[in-house]
Design a protein with these regions (language model features):
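Flexible glycine/proline-rich, aromatic-decorated loop/lid segments
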Residues: 187-203, 417
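A generic structural motif
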Residues: 116, 206-208, 324-332, 361
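A short core secondary-structure module
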Residues: 159, 215-236
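Acidic, glycine-rich active-site loops and adjacent beta-strand->loop/helix elements
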Residues: 85-87, 109, 145-153, 176-181, ...
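An extended, acidic, His-containing surface patch that forms the Zn2+-binding/catalytic region
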Residues: 49, 182-183, 240-317, 328-338, ...
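Acidic/histidine-rich catalytic neighborhood of metal-dependent amide-processing enzymes
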Residues: 116-191, 453
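Active-site metal-coordination/substrate-binding segment of hydrolases
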Residues: 76-143, 437
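N-terminal helical capping/dimerization or prosegment-like subdomains
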Residues: 1-93, 317, 334
Length: 453
């Protein structure tokens, strides 16, 4: 019955999704401020059409929130669905094979910005609710909260949650904004890494200098910056910042055995990335490095003359953007300060170093023995025919730990993305058959959750 409904309504549901995708809700670009409001309003319309009791676009200190609810019984359990309607910028446009905000279906995939992250995945949740509501199968309450700033750090959502705790009160949170190991290998994300981010500025002379007249007499800020950041990581892949690993919890032998059982083709992985060899912290597998271990990376570096031709200067300043992915129990505020203190301590006298802290967030671990997780397991089994593997991933959704802190509930991360979906990149896509299976799986989650509740 579920599969039949999804198949019969496929074209309508896809067109509804496309109406969201066509709105370029790029939160990072002020030019799209009105598009953020338009997208929020469209979400409100679609949730009302799906059958919620009420839906509203609510103000925040930044982009608006979309809230909706269907209360079947005030005494029943409540599932809160979280997602985000903002998307990453589509640039560089010339690398897209299709128009990023004009979705098309080609080769069995939806091609568009937001096809996966997160309009495509969030809309699965709305369509699963639609089915349950239309067929009088919903035995627990449902609430929805969609924000418009996830791609820029969710700056408004924390204060919004704090202000509306009663409105958002629930027993569990359900999120589709993560991925699967493979199209036929279901998995549930049980861990997210946290994040710290900085910009470092190294200043030498008070102006750009002629490299002939002054070369050899003063330090070059770019050279100094390169050495400073290169020295952070040793040849063994270890991060040399004092105290960095103090709160890192080692994976148990049981967890490491589970990780080792996850299907992973290292040669195919290297091929897909276009690299000849992998590099990371010694003593850990690639999956462990990306899910269970912290990192330190340079995200961008610049300074001096970078235009066409030649200009022989010693620059006055050099800059870099830095990030760390953190594991549960590492406090991003503590790590941020450790990094600032480290660079200040190793900065040579012939330059001035300034490290500016940017946004950050904590990691998250989901237990695999509580009712909602078990319901998710059975939901995947019903559709994919096999039990999903619990996996930790390298990415961050900082607001998940905020939900736990402010609302006191756990989140189940039922994602359906694939690495090949190219989120944040040109040619983002989502396989149509996987999108439909996602709707079916979420429906089954709710049916199984009622048995647990």
């Amino acid at each position: 019955m579920i599969k039949k409904y999804v198949e019969e309504n496929k074209d309508r549901m896809l067109e509804e999704l496309f109406s969201l995708i066509r709105i370029p809700s790029v939160s990072a670009q002020p030019a799209h401020k009105e598009d953020m409001v338009r997208c929020a309003e469209r979400w409100k319309e679609l949730l009302l059409e799906a059958g919620v009791d009420k839906a509203e676009v609510m103000p925040s200190k930044g982009n608006p929130m979309v809230y909706a609810e269907r209360i079947v019984d005030p005494n029943a359990k409540t599932v809160l669905v979280y997602g985000h309607y903002d998307v990453m910028p589509a640039e560089p446009f010339e690398l897209w094979k299709t128009e990023p905000f004009e979705p098309v279906i080609k080769d069995g995939h939806i091609w568009a910005r937001g096809a996966d992250d997160d309009k495509g995945q969030s809309f699965m949740q709305a369509k699963a609710f639609e089915y349950l509501n239309k067929n009088d199968l919903l035995k627990h309450n449902m609430k929805f909260i969609f924000e418009g700033e996830e791609e820029i750090g969710s700056g408004s959502l924390g204060p919004f949650i704090e202000e509306h705790k009663e409105l958002l009160a629930c027993d569990v949170i359900l999120v589709s904004d993560t991925g699967l190991i493979g199209p036929d290998t279901p998995s549930i994300t049980t861990g997210l890494r946290g994040l710290s981010y900085w910009q470092i500025e190294v200043t030498g002379p008070n102006r750009d200098l002629h490299s002939g007249t002054f070369g050899g007499a003063v330090a070059n800020p770019i050279n100094v910056l390169c050495k400073l950041i290169a020295d952070v990581t040793g040849p063994d892949g270890k991060i040399r910042i004092p105290g960095f690993y103090d709160d890192v919890e080692e994976a148990s032998d049981e967890e490491r055995k589970l990780v080792a059982s996850i299907p992973f083709d290292e040669e195919e992985y290297k091929k897909s990335l276009g690299v000849k060899a992998l590099f990371g912290e010694e003593g850990y597998s690639t999956i462990e490095r990306t899910g269970y271990r912290p990192t330190f990376d340079v995200c961008g570096i610049w300074g001096g003359y970078t235009g066409d031709g030649a200009k022989t200067v010693i620059p006055s300043k050099a800059y870099a953007k830095l990030s760390s992915r953190l594991v549960p129990h590492q406090d991003h505020t503590k790590i941020s300060q450790l990094v600032v203190d480290y660079f200040n301590s190793v900065a040579p006298d012939y330059v001035t170093v300034n490290v500016e802290k940017h946004h950050g967030g904590h990691g998250y671990v989901c237990p695999i023995d509580f009712p909602a997780y078990k319901a998710a397991e059975r939901g995947f089994e019903a559709v994919f025919g096999k039990r999903p593997l619990p996996v930790r991933i390298g990415g961050s959704i900082p607001i998940i730990s905020t939900f736990e802190k402010l609302l006191g509930v756990k989140t189940v991360l039922m994602g359906f993305g694939l690495e090949s979906n190219a989120i944040h990149s040109p040619n983002e896509n989502m396989p149509v058959d996987l999108w439909l299976k996602g709707i079916e799986t979420i429906i089954n989650f709710h049916l199984e959750y009622d048995k647990e509740a």
